[in-house]
Amino acid sequence: MSDLNDVQENAKLNSETRNTGKAEPPHGTTEYVAEAEISKNGVGSPKKSPKKGKVGKGDNNKVETELVHTALLEKDNPFMEEGPTGFTKSALLEIPGMRSHNLKNPNEDYEDDSEGLLPLNQESNAETCRTSLSGSINSMNGETSASEEPSVSNRKKSARIHILEAKRVSEGQGRAYIAYVIQFENSTVQRRYSDFESLRSILIRLFPMTLIPPIPEKQSIKNYGKSITGSSSKYLLPSEGSGSVDLSLSVIHASVNNSDEKLIRHRIRMLTEFLNKLLTNEEITKTSIITDFLDPNNHNWHEFVNSSSTFSSLPKSILQCNPLDPTNTTRIHAMLPIPGSSSQLLLNKESNDKKMDKERSKSFTNIEQDYKQYENLLDNGIYKYNRRTTKTYHDLKSDYNEIGEVFAQFAHEQAQVGELAEQLSYLSNAFSGSSISLEKLVGRLYYNINEPLNESVHMATSARELIKYRKLKYLQNEMIKKSLNSKRAQLEKLEAQNNEYKDVDKIIDNEMSKSHTINLERPNNNTGSGGKSYGGKLFNGFNKLASMVKDSVKYQETDPHTASINLKKEIEQLSESLEVTENDLEVISKVIKNDQLPKFSKEREVDLSEILKHYSRYMRNYARQNLEIWKEVKRHQDFA
């Protein structure tokens, strides 16, 4: 009955659209160009041209690089309408270029689509996302060049990897693991979780300045059951996917409980996204590591890694490798110190006292704080409360199902009263129908909303790891500076002592040159006390014995000349290390701030926008279906 009402309502809406002749403007390039002109030219009237704006050569120099802001503001709400020009709720909302942006309710795009799927590769999604959130973390570079736009919209179109199945494989002696069958083009390969973990570890060492997508955290079924809400709950797998992942295509060939199933599907989703994002990274795809990982001929991935001279020669720490080419690490890179926790605290204090690298350090400190706040808002805010909401809907679904059964039993007992039994039957059917609708909603919220939000949290963590790498490189540079200054001070002190010794030697030589004879006779003791003379000799004997013991315990100090030579060698090595780390730090800071973080911001904007569109559509469809169910009950009650 509800399906028939949906069809009638859709037909009514279509007829109204034809009568009025007014159609909603599609998400085209015209709207995007208008917004682009505003963002480039500042406050002013947009140029309403249907053609894409071209970015001039000098435009990039005119736009100053802004800091990254990760605050989730009211403008992120797709239902928020443009407020009056004079409102100032908070300082965070006062972002240049936001007043000229007209937000649109995404429900209006799918007003006549109650059960159809939200297009996964809708081009208008990317176009809409580019013009939204212009003041959040995606505004690092001030504007988006035309050459960068297709890479964002084509990111999900180029996804070609699917995990077809997950099966339990026995290792013998009662041990087993879950193997994932990966389909890439026309071939399939089987990999386990530790293989993905090894691949990501290698990628981090091969591309230390690149944002490597996350993989699901390594944890047991027991720990994962504690980390998710309602671990014993079973969620209906939706027929449509989210992003480039369609979990309905993946089959679990194993006898698993609800917690195991959710963990496996959680891993399937994140591992699929991990591989698909790697395929869209031009820098990584220039190498053969991804094709090697997906090659069925490399049956055992760990054996392949151990047999590769390239992988085995990589430095264990990314702080001791050449960031531009880790496979060509120099001797100086291999000797660089690795900052520890104590050195970080000490150097942070000294850097604050001396105010070293004020602008660059302050810039990245603010960026790190913004990303940390953004990650916290996602994890402990949106993701947390969406999990709680999903659990509440799941419990409500069970309550609706139970109360529907109660009304059905009551109607059976009141069968002799025809009118009352009929009303009770209608109520029973209404609650049962609402329970079914809630079950569909809960499954979509869990798999298509909560799981993508969890992935966004992990992506924010990976971005902060990239910022942390730059911070550790900065601390490494400060350690070398501190050590170099200390060695130079020691050398100056040693040279000053040598000069003093030379002056003393000159004085002695001058005194000896005046007299050719040296008086070796012992001076007369006029004290007249023989006991004191004997005691003095005994005391001198003890002093000699003590000095012999002291020399046997302590190492003999090197002569000043040798110490001076060693210090000069150390200073030369530290100077070379300082030059290398300063060049590395400059390159790392430039790549992370101007390339990796803006790219992450654009992708994050597209992902969050798609999540919000899915969320609003799911809630709207459930509300519409539930309303029709209770309208039907009311019609029967009115006729009774």
Swiss-Prot record:
Top-level taxon: Eukaryota
Coiled coil start-end: 475-512, 562-593
UniProt cross-references to SUPFAM superfamilies, sorted A to Z: PX domain
Region of interest: Disordered: 1-63, 126-156
Record carries keyword Transmembrane helix: no
Keywords: Acetylation, Autophagy, Coiled coil, Endosome, Lipid-binding, Membrane, Phosphoprotein, Protein transport, Transport
Binding site for a 1,2-diacyl-sn-glycero-3-phospho-(1D-myo-inositol-3-phosphate): R192, S194, K218, R267
Domain PX span(s) in chain numbering: 140-301
Topology versus the membrane: Peripheral membrane protein
Modified sites of kind N-acetylserine: S2
Any Gene Ontology CC annotation: cytosol
Residue stretches of biased makeup (Polar residues): 1-18, 126-153
GO biological process: autophagy of mitochondrion; cytoplasm to vacuole targeting by the Cvt pathway; early endosome to Golgi transport; intracellular protein transport; macroautophagy; reticulophagy; retrograde transport, endosome to Golgi
Record's subcellular location: Endosome membrane; Preautophagosomal structure membrane
Modified residues (Phosphoserine): S361, S363
Gene Ontology molecular functions: phosphatidylinositol-3-phosphate binding
Keyword Methyltransferase: no
InterPro entries: AH/BAR_dom_sf, PX_dom, PX_dom_sf, PX_Snx41/Atg20, Sorting_Nexin_Autophagy
Family note: Belongs to the sorting nexin family.
Function of the protein: Required for cytoplasm to vacuole transport (Cvt), pexophagy and mitophagy. Also involved in endoplasmic reticulum-specific autophagic process and is essential for the survival of cells subjected to severe ER stress. Functions in protein retrieval from the endocytic pathway. Required for proper sorting of the v-SNARE protein SNC1.
Domain comment as written in the entry: The PX domain binds phosphatidylinositol 3-phosphate which is necessary for peripheral membrane localization of ATG20 to the perivacuolar punctate structures.
Other notes: Present with 358 molecules/cell in log phase SD medium.
SUBUNIT field: Forms a complex with SNX4 and ATG17.
Record's protein name: Autophagy-related protein 20
Taxonomic path: Eukaryota, Fungi, Dikarya, Ascomycota, Saccharomycotina
